[in-house]
Structure formats: C-alpha cells, structure tokens
C-alpha cells in the first residue's frame, strides 16, 4: 500500500495480513512473503521510474524507535540522486549524532 505521508514518490508499505505489533512477531513464512513482496515492489518501481537509483527498506519496532502505528509494516522508500544533500550513512541518520562516521581503510 502507499504511505499516507510519503518520504518520496512511490514510498510504499508492506503490511502483513495478520494483526501483529511489529516485525519481530512475524513468523518465518511471513518474513519470506514480505521479502518477496519487497523485491517485487523494488522491480515494479524501478521499471516505472528510471530516476530511482536506490532504496531504503525498514521498519520501526517500538515507540522509542519511532513506531506510531502498532501494526507491523515495512517501508520501501525509493531514492533518487539529489533527494538529500549527502546520503552517506543511510539508515544511520535515525540518530543524527551518529550519522557521521569515518570509514576505516
């Protein structure tokens, strides 16, 4: 389904049918089904929009992690060149003070 407050165009949600609070309550079969759907979404979005060059895939599990809807859902967020000034660090940006790091060679 589409996110009600999309971060980018085609920001989508994978929502399991079973009513559970978060990703960690999914069983193995549900995880595989979600993963399959995530891959299909990635392919569909990439074919539909050639400006998409990457994806963020993630879930918020628990109030302190930013979860506000307590039914498991997984975000699939298409990314494009220039949608942020510096994408380095990716999901590390959830804690702003930790988003900058030095790569060890």
Locate the predicted segments by residue:
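HIT superfamily nucleotide-processing domains
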Residues: 1-105
